[in-house]
Amino acid sequence: MTIYLFDGTMDGLLTAVFDAFSLKEQPEELLTEGDALPLFCERTYQVTTDEEKARRVWTGLEKKLTREAMKLISVSWLSEQKELNTPLFRYVCKVFRQGDISRNYADADVLAVTNIARKVLHEQLRMKQFIRFQKAKDGTYLAVVSPDHNVLPIIIDHFQDRFNDQPWLIYDAKRHYGFNYDGKTVIRITFEDESAVPFDLTNGKLDESVISSDDQLLQNLWRTYFKAICIKERLNPRKQLNDMPRRYWKYMTEKN
């Protein structure tokens, strides 16, 4: 049994595909460095990430797959799930051997990659629905999130289109980065010292010293409205949890 080890990056995975074809091998698994090896592992091969090799593999995929299938691969990678590594590696290898297999759901690897991508896209939709902004005194709107998957890169266009006339910051507290829009361009940002930021990473609330007084009033009005429209006789907690999972509540105004 041959196992390939890589650095956990997309370029690393694509390099592994390049090396597998160059060496004429079909490794049983693709694992990240430090993962426990299977009991009957006979040989390991350390993949050295090479951007040029990765670029050539990606260009080759673009020639064989539809735009939709390429998007599926990119989206699945945003899941950050280790169990994706081997199925996605085999999926890409099969594309070069068999052509476009993106709709062959009888193939276990295609099905695994597709299902993971669908979970990411589902959370992308939920983020668009559940993000709550707060207005700071300087006019900037802040939203803090901590999604299961790394969906910020695929939701930013939505907010740039919808709120293109106001500055905002959407920050992923789980991955310690965000996107800031100044009214013209969007840039990716990180904070050297998160303890010094003027908001609480655990619930997304702005410090009282920087939150707009108008926003405080609107938050109270929104909570009042949310309670007022509730019809006790029609409460369905199970459906509410299904439509609005509890893990999102800590950042939602109406739940705090």
Task: Give, region by region, the residue ranges found by the protein language model.
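N-terminal ordered "arm"
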Residues: M1-E51
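Short, charged/polar micro-motifs that form catalytic or ligand-binding hotspots
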Residues: I3-G8, R43, V47, R103-A106, ...
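Short, hydrophobic/amphipathic alpha-helical patches that form generic packing surfaces
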Residues: G12-L23, R90-K94, D157-D161, N220-K227
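Charged, alpha-helical interface segments at or near domain boundaries
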Residues: L31-K128
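Acidic, Ser/Thr-rich peripheral helices and adjacent loops at domain boundaries
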Residues: Y45-K53, V186-D200
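Short coil/turn segments at secondary-structure boundaries
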Residues: K71-S76, N104, A173, L235-L241
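Internal, well-folded beta-alpha domain core
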Residues: I101-E194
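Long, compositionally biased intrinsically disordered terminal regions
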Residues: P167, E194, P198-N256
